[in-house]
C-alpha cells in the first residue's frame, strides 16, 4: 500500500515479484540505505515518489516492457541507473529518465542439484538463467511452496525440515521462472538382518 516501506532505513535491496500489479505512492520513500530495486514484469502501475529520498539508490532494474508512470524524476539521485530489457527498447524510448540503459534480460531459468534429502540435511540448488552473460542473471528470488517441509535461502541452500514434498521456484525480474519438486524423506534403515 501507500508508504508501505517509507523510511525503512535498514532496507538495502528490494525485489518486487511478478504477481504485484501496482506500486503505491511513496512506497519506498526515505529508505536511505536502499541501493538496488528490481521491479518484476507484472507491475503495470507505478505511483508518484516511490523512491523519493532514497539517497543511496544505485540501480533500478525493470523486468518488463510497459509501466504506467510519467517520470522517475523524484528518483534522480546522482549516479542512479535505470535498466530496461533491450528487447523492449521501443516501449522505453518515450520515457525521460537520466542514466537509462538496456540489458539482456533472462528469457529462461533452470534449477539443478539434489532434489531429495533427509530431515535436518542441507543441500544447495543451482539456478542458471539464460542467455548466458546477462547483466542481471544472478538476480532472482527463490521460494518454497511449503517452508515447513523445506526452506530455501537466496543462495540456494535448502534446509530439509520435515518429511513431505515442496515445490521450489526461482523467479527472475523479467518474469522467467522454473520449478522443481523437492522431497524430504527419512533415511533408509541400514544393516537390517
State each model region's role.
Residues 7-10, 16, 30, 39, ...:
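Repetitive beta-strand solenoid architecture
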Residues 14-16, 20-23, 37-39, 43-46, ...:
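Hydrophobic aliphatic residue packing
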Residues 8-22, 32-45, 55-70, 78-89:
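Structural signature of tandem-repeat unit edges
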Residues 1-12, 86-87, 103-105, 192-193:
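Short intrinsically disordered, low-complexity coil segments enriched in acidic
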Residues 103-193:
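Extracytoplasmic soluble-region selector
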Amino acid at each position: 500500500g501507500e508508504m508501505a516501506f517509507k523510511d525503512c532505513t535498514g532496507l538495502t535491496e528490494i525485489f518486487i515479484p511478478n504477481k504485484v500489479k501496482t506500486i503505491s505512492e511513496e512506497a519506498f520513500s526515505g529508505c536511505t540505505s536502499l541501493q538496488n530495486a528490481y521491479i518484476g514484469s507484472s507491475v503495470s502501475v507505478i505511483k508518484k515518489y516511490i523512491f523519493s529520498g532514497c539517497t543511496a539508490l544505485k540501480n533500478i532494474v525493470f523486468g518488463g516492457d510497459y509501466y504506467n508512470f510519467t517520470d522517475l524524476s523524484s528518483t534522480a539521485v546522482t549516479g542512479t541507473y535505470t535498466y530496461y530489457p533491450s528487447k523492449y527498447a521501443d516501449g522505453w524510448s518515450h520515457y525521460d529518465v537520466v542514466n537509462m540503459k538496456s540489458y539482456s534480460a533472462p528469457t529462461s531459468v533452470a534449477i539443478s542439484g539434489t532434489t531429495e534429502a533427509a530431515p535436518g540435511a542441507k543441500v544447495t540448488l543451482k539456478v542458471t538463467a539464460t542467455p548466458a552473460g546477462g547483466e542481471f542473471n544472478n538476480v532472482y528470488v527463490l521460494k518454497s511452496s511449503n517452508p515447513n517441509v523445506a526452506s530455501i535461502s537466496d543462495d540456494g541452500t535448502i534446509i530439509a525440515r520435515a518429511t513431505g514434498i515442496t515445490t521450489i521456484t526461482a523467479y527472475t525480474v523479467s518474469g522467467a521462472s522454473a520449478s522443481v519438486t523437492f522431497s524430504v524423506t527419512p533415511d533408509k534403515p541400514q544393516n537390517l538382518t
